[in-house]
Amino acid sequence: KRYREKAAMMTTAVNVPLRQITRYDLNIASGIIHSAKENEITSIITGLHHKANITDSFFGVLAGHLLKRLNCELIISKFLIPVHTLKRIVVAVPPKAEYESGFPRWMEHFCRMGSTLGCRVHFFANEKTTAHLQTLIKKKHKQVLTDFSLLEDWNDLLVLTGQVSYDHLLVIISARPGTLSYDSSFEKLPRQLSK
């Protein structure tokens, strides 16, 4: 309840409507899954699981269940500083992400966030995806301060760590197996991110 109230305060502060839902279920994952389906929820935001021991997965059991059983946007976050102190948002975008149905939605999220915070949104993507990003931003998000850099090889994701400072938000766009922009290198993401 405390976290729900805190989330409501945060969304109100940035003019994002939030409808609070209370549900009792067998476990947290099934409660979220059933609520998402019943209420046609399109986006779920959850914190990054705290790895308690060596056998725990990087994303944890909850995120694993949500990824397997839901087909909606899942934002797994770990903020080390207050959001309002961010100076830049660095977004790594995989090839062919522009062909995914969620492309405009996450673009909207990060452009709105950059605009609200008054910080730059720096996209790293290949040439084709960058062209789609630029077109969408010119159409719908002209006011957002943006930068674009080439990220030719998704395996070079660790190169981005040199671009990220303590007051930056690193966003890595990923896709589920079987989708157009899915790449087998996504399986390495948890290991790369934990470094």
Placement of each model-derived feature along the sequence:
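Well-ordered alpha-helical segments embedded in enzymatic catalytic cores
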Residues: 6, 31, 105-109
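Intrinsically disordered or low-complexity boundary/linker segments at protein termini
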Residues: 1, 15, 37, 42-128, ...
